[in-house]
């Protein structure tokens, strides 16, 4: 544009010069021509200066316009470049995300294939190991059978040479020596037989369990023998069971309570006929859930802690009942004994509430007959206290109650009332007769007691007594509503081989002495522990 303007200025100057030249020719005189030329030159100079100034203005305006246009073009180019860069980055980001997803899928697939390969390898090793084990056991059994046959032949030949022994005496000696020498072999054979029928016993066990559930269905059993513990979520069930069931076995062994974990959401059921054990198990389980640390050592710690806490609660129950009946001056040991009755039932009736009820009834009857109301209340309240400890001390609850009443210097009328309330001895006072009548009123009213519950609890107690009668037994617990007796033995007194023999002897004694529906599983557990402290 600047060149165009410059050309126009030059053309204009040319025209002016031409005009001056023509004008000069037309002048006739030299002076006129010179004057005209001078004027024309001056005008041309003026016009040229103006043209140059105008051209400079036009050039600067053109430069400004050109710079503005260049800036606009530069901004447009930058904007297009930015948009293009954003589109490219978006495409790259999408491609990177897709590549990451593909990489994750490939990694998962590779991990899955590795796990499957490892599982197949483990199964193959396990099968090889089992095959080798079966081969070794078969060879060992054959060798033992040959040894037994040889030994029996030698025994028979040796005894046959002894003329003074009769056939029966020789038979007894053979049997005694054989049983002593082959105790390990007997235990091994029993274990082998149990393993052989284990695979076929699943269906039979399920049928027996269904029969037991049908025969024991009833509200009074559910209300008296189970406790429900609610869980925060179903994941807690796996933690309660523990690795290979160690946690749940520890809890059952320490409390003697059956822990039932089924498909019921967020619920664990504690089943057992002893309410004290069941309450300790409930407290322990709730503490474990709240604490979050669930392992055998923690379970043992909490069970011991809750046993101490249960002792305190028992004392509080006894104090509350004594205050309710109006006998606040009872000996502290008697208060604790009475508190234990909160966790004892008789034919389904709570014995502590029954004792309070008998005391109140006896007080009312004594008031009507003009007898000592406070003494009648006290005698009625204490008449069944022997039931609190009849499981730990030999003798009937009447005999135990009399012994403790004398020990803690109770009134002779109270002692006679305890002795006579079941008709074992003659009553010596009107109060003894009143308490016997109150006892009959409390226990005989409709709905107060349930015969089936008492028979059920008696069967469980008899199971435990049979097991505890064997030498070396440390603890015995009846579980699974009487379908299992679990026996803990002292490892120093009972060997591994004797454990198997003991289980069969317990089974035989149960079959001889008890009547029961279905089957009862006998489990004998021998556990050796070594504890030391680093100082």
Swiss-Prot record:
The chain crosses the membrane at residues 4-24. Its EC number is 3.1.-.-. Residues 225-285 form the KH domain. Residues 351-444 form the HD domain. It is an enzyme of class 3 (hydrolase). The keyword Magnesium does not apply. GO terms for cellular component: plasma membrane. Keywords: Cell membrane, Endonuclease, Hydrolase, Membrane, Nuclease, RNA-binding, Transmembrane, Transmembrane helix. Its main location: membrane. One of its GO terms (biological process) is mRNA catabolic process. Residues 107-145 are annotated as: Disordered. PANTHER family: RIBONUCLEASE Y. Endoribonuclease that initiates mRNA decay. This is Ribonuclease Y. It comes from Streptococcus agalactiae serotype V (strain ATCC BAA-611 / 2603 V/R). The gene is rny.
């Amino acid at each position: 544009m600047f060149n165009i303007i410059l050309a126009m200025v030059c053309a204009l100057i040319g025209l002016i010069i031409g005009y001056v030249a023509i004008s000069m020719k037309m002048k006739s005189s030299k002076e006129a021509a010179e004057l005209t030329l001078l004027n024309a030159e001056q005008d041309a100079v003026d016009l040229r200066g103006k043209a140059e100034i105008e051209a400079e203005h036009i050039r600067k305006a053109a430069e400004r316009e050109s710079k503005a246009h260049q800036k606009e073009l530069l901004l447009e180019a930058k904007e297009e470049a930015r948009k293009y860069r954003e589109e490219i980055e978006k495409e790259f980001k999408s491609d990177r995300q897709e590549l990451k997803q593909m990489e994750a899928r490939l990694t998962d697939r590779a991990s899955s294939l590795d796990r499957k390969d490892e599982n197949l390898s483990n199964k193959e090793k396990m099968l090889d190991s089992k095959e080798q084990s079966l081969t070794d056991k078969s060879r060992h059994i054959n060798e033992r059978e040959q040894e037994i046959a040889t030994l029996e032949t030698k025994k028979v030949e040796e005894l046959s040479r002894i003329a003074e022994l009769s056939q029966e005496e020789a038979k007894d000696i053979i049997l005694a020596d054989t049983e002593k020498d082959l105790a390990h072999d007997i235990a091994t054979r029993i274990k082998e037989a149990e393993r052989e029928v284990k695979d076929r016993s699943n269906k039979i066990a399920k049928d027996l369990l269904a029969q037991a559930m049908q025969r024991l269905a009833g509200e009074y059993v559910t209300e008296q023998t189970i406790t429900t513990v609610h869980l925060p979520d179903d994941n807690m069930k796996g933690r309660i069971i523990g690795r290979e069931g160690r946690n749940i076995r520890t809890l059952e062994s320490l409390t003697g309570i059956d822990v039932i974990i089924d498909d019921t959401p967020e619920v664990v059921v504690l089943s057992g006929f002893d309410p004290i054990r069941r309450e300790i198990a409930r407290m322990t389980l709730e503490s474990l859930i709240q604490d979050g640390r669930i392992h055998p050592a923690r379970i043992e710690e909490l069970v011991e802690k809750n046993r101490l806490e249960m002792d305190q609660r028992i004392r509080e129950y006894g104090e509350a009942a004594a205050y309710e009946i109006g006998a606040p001056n009872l000996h502290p040991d008697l208060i604790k004994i009475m508190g234990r009755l909160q966790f004892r039932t008789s034919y389904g009736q709570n014995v502590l509430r029954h004792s309070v009820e008998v005391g109140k009834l006896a007080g009312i009857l004594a008031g009507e007959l003009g007898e000592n109301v406070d003494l009648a209340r006290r005698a009625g309240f204490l008449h069944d206290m022997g039931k609190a400890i009849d499981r730990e001390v030999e003798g009937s609850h009447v005999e135990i109650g009399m012994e403790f009443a004398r020990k803690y210097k109770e009134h002779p009328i109270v002692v006679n009332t305890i002795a006579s309330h079941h008709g074992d001895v003659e009553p010596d006072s009107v109060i003894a007769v009143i308490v016997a009548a109150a006892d009959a009123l409390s226990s005989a009213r409709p709905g107060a007691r349930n015969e089936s519950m008492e028979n059920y609890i008696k069967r469980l107690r008899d199971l435990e007594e049979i097991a505890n009668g064997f030498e070396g037994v440390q603890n015995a617990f009846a579980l699974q509503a009487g379908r299992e007796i679990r026996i803990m033995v002292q490892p120093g007194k009972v060997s591994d081989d004797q454990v198997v023999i003991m289980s069969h002897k317990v089974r035989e004694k149960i079959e001889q002495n008890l009547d029961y529906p279905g089957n009862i599983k006998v489990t004998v557990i021998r556990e050796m522990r070594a504890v030391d402290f680093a100082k």
